[in-house]
Amino acid sequence: MLWDPNEVVDSRVVSSSEWWIDLKDYKELEAKAGVYLFANAKYDIKYIGTAGARRMVEEVKCAIDRKKSKGATKVRALYTNSTEKAQSLEKYLIAKYNPVNNQT
């Protein structure tokens, strides 16, 4: 399913990465709690993951190492105020987008 830009309006999201960045540049993400999304060039969501406080870059790297980025070329982060809000947002987004790499 293609990314809906209105998702950043969710009350759990306090900020987000400026836009989608190349997956290879994931270290540019801020080290905050939140949800990260992998997508292809057409913004079809391939994977959604969560990161606790100060763990965004580490969690994205771990997901890449676990091959969760298969078919993806872009990454975006939606930052939250807490791990709990990140987990709640992740659950909602996975249910909505049903990403292929979350099923493996």
Protein language model features and the residues they cover:
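GIY-YIG nuclease catalytic motif and its immediate N-terminal context
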Residues: 1-56, 84-92
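A short, exposed loop/beta-hairpin motif centered on an aromatic-Gly-Thr core
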Residues: 45-48, 73-81
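Acidic, divalent-metal-binding catalytic cores of TOPRIM
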Residues: 95
